[in-house]
Amino acid sequence: MVKKTFFTTLAAVSFSAALETALFFSGCGSSLWTTKAHANSVFSSLMQQQGFADIVSQVKPAVVSVQVKSNKKKKEWFFSDFFSTPGFDQLPDQHPLKKFFQDFYNRDKPSNKSLQRSHRLRPIAFGSGFFISSDGYIVTNNHVISDGTSYAVVLDDGTELNAKLIGTDPRTDLAVLKVNEKRKFSYVDFGDDSKLRVGDWVVAIGNPFGLGGTVTAGIVSARGRDIGTGVYDDFIQIDAAVNRGNSGGPTFDLNGKVVGVNTAIFSPSGGNVGIAFAIPAATAKQVVQQLIEKGLVQRGWLGVQIQPVTKEISDSIGLKEAKGALITDPLKGPAAKAGIKAGDVIISVNGEKINDVRDLAKRIANMSPGETVTLGVWKSGKEENIKVKLDSMPEDENMKDGSKYSNEHGNSDETLEDYGLIVAPSDDGVGLVVTDVDPDSDAADKGIRPGDVIVTVNNKSVKKVSDITDTIKNAQKLGRKAILLQVRTNDQNRFVALPIFKK
């Protein structure tokens, strides 16, 4: 049986929906191998740690439960949905855990009359948040409030207050609410997450499964995690127990400073397995400040589609290191206006080297529209400095301007036998259409499929097979180990490095 492992955001849509995950009970043991001197120092340090009560008492009043109301139809409640998860159905009827969850079910379960009027119900989603100012600004996750029409927060003392949505930033999954009350609220400050080390203690506070004010502790497991949610991924991984409903809640260091905003977990079941992810404080602080001041986040925009530079790609273009960001498609934007083209590699921004595509995206996003930057660009085998005036990032980044082609080409097919490709001229004369691929070839391994269009080879336009073979010969003379194909698939550009076949 194959287990499905997935990332999930942590907002709980009603208490029953949040519990549609399996409960598992197990025990484990482990051994710590170390020298005596080191062990003594570690245990001595642990003995000095008197728990987290002092920190919790300091910061907990600033943490809130976020309730989101929506006009969407509420999911009907079924006892079988609620309790038939693996593990739960095996518990005795009098088991305290089963009784505990049954109490919650019965507490929130609507009556028969209200079920008959289900179209008038307004479902509630639960999440977490925290005050960052005495005048009522609250940070939470965008996915917590994204479907809402009205919002409320429950304070640590149980007081419920209405809140107003100030702004959201889906790209970083952050949002800001505001409570307008003539009182001062307890609040917390953002800390310096750059000082956070793997192995440092952290404390998470939130509203898992609607259980407000829940405190858990753990350590920093890793930094700079990319979990595939977007180009701005740069998560702090922690092993503190984090579950659905913890979304938007804070992660604190031992100084009581917010070092992260909990947003996702990695789990085979949907519940906590000790792998949670928090947005770094540095990112949250910058985004939140703009949301409060402007109601939105304005980012610098180059107007390019990019892909990673692999070792094979760097070899094919004569780049010493497999670093930077390869331009697959310059959209109609600032970069194209400055002369940046597909196949160019951005290797630095204002003199600072770029490691990868995420590095470039973050640096440009942290700049302001209208700002002029100097890009180090690897173009046609040499480095050039190009100045680009950034624009504002549009709402739709998926702008496409691809060539059209057909897979019907009669008898005009030509063969690149050494590379396992059969190609034909495209209908619009731009590139060569791949009509067949040898499944055992390097091209197939690199994901080239029939219907793809080879637009350029080593940044030179191709219209016939001889354009490719001539480029290969020139690359061999230069001692290159691979050729770089610009391939268009369904109007999306990418670059593929193919090893040069030596006869």
Curated annotation (Swiss-Prot):
Active site per UniProt: H143 (charge relay system), D173 (charge relay system), S247 (charge relay system)
Record has RNA-binding as a keyword: no
Residues binding substrate, per UniProt: G245, N246, S247, L302, G303, V304, Q305, I306
Reactions catalysed according to its record: Acts on substrates that are at least partially unfolded. The cleavage site P1 residue is normally between a pair of hydrophobic residues, such as Val-|-Val
Protein name, per record: Probable periplasmic serine endoprotease DegP-like
Residues of the PDZ domain: 286-357, 419-466
EC number, UniProt record: 3.4.21.107
Signal peptide (residue range): 1-18
UniProt-annotated location(s): Periplasm
Origin: domain of life: Bacteria
PANTHER family hit by this protein: SERINE PROTEASE FAMILY S1C HTRA-RELATED, SERINE PROTEASE HTRA2, MITOCHONDRIAL
Cited InterPro entries: PDZ, PDZ_6, PDZ_sf, Pept_S1C_Do, Peptidase_S1_PA, Peptidase_S1C
Lineage: Bacteria, Pseudomonadati, Pseudomonadota, Alphaproteobacteria, Hyphomicrobiales
GO molecular function: serine-type endopeptidase activity
Function: Could be efficient in the degradation of transiently denatured and unfolded proteins which accumulate in the periplasm following stress conditions.
GO biological process entries: proteolysis
Annotated family: Belongs to the peptidase S1C family.
Family annotation (SUPFAM superfamilies): PDZ domain-like, Trypsin-like serine proteases
Pfam families reported for this sequence: PDZ_2 (PF13180), PDZ_6 (PF17820), Trypsin_2 (PF13365)
Cellular component, GO annotation: outer membrane-bounded periplasmic space
UniProt keyword Metal-binding present: no
